[in-house]
Design a protein with these regions (language model features):
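Conserved hydrophobic beta-strand positions in leucine-rich repeat
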Residues: 23-27, 53-55, 81-83, 107-111
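Intrinsically disordered, low-complexity polyampholyte segments enriched for Lys and acidic residues
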Residues: 34-35, 42-48, 56-59, 63, ...
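Leucine-rich repeat
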Residues: 6-15, 34-42, 62-71, 90-98, ...
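Leucine-rich solenoid repeat scaffolds
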Residues: 81, 109, 125, 129-131
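Inter-repeat linker/turn residues at the boundaries of leucine-rich repeats
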Residues: 17-20, 45-48, 73-76, 101-104, ...
Length: 132
């Protein structure tokens, strides 16, 4: 495990917002929390080459999921977003589901080992019915 944390995520996000070649970024199990996900989300709004972002086993929670969902509204490059085991509940999934309605580029969203519950599953189901 690499301890990157929110400060490390900030530095990576600054570079990512300017990078034009990287397609995959694996940041699983690096101690990123909601603040770090905000930095990464802001970078995703500017980046148009990253296709895979792996944030499994971090601590972004519902707020972090909302930040990333907001970025998905603008980002048209990301194809795979790994968010397994991040403490995301139905509240966070609500924002991700709404982003899926608008974003037609993302085709893999991993929410394994989160407690999305029935509400989260319903939000995702509704979004998938309306995603074209």
């Amino acid at each position: 495990m690499i301890t990157l944390g929110d400060d490390g995520a900030m530095h990576l996000a600054n570079a990512l917002s300017k990078n034009t070649t990287l397609t995959t970024l694996d940041l699983h199990w690096t101690e990123i929390e909601k603040e770090g996900s905000l930095y990464l989300a802001n970078a995703l709004k500017k980046n148009n080459t990253l296709t895979t972002l792996d944030l499994k086993w971090n601590k972004i929670g519902d707020e972090g999921a909302q930040y990333l969902a907001d970025a998905l509204g603008q980002n048209k490059a990301l194809v795979t977003l790994q968010l397994a085991a991040n403490g995301i509940s139905g509240k966070g999934v609500y924002h991700l589901a709404n982003a899926l309605i608008e974003n037609t580029t993302l085709n893999t969203l991993n929410l394994d080992s989160n407690k999305i519950g029935t509400d989260g599953a319903q939000h995702l189901g509704n979004a998938l019915c309306n995603n074209s």
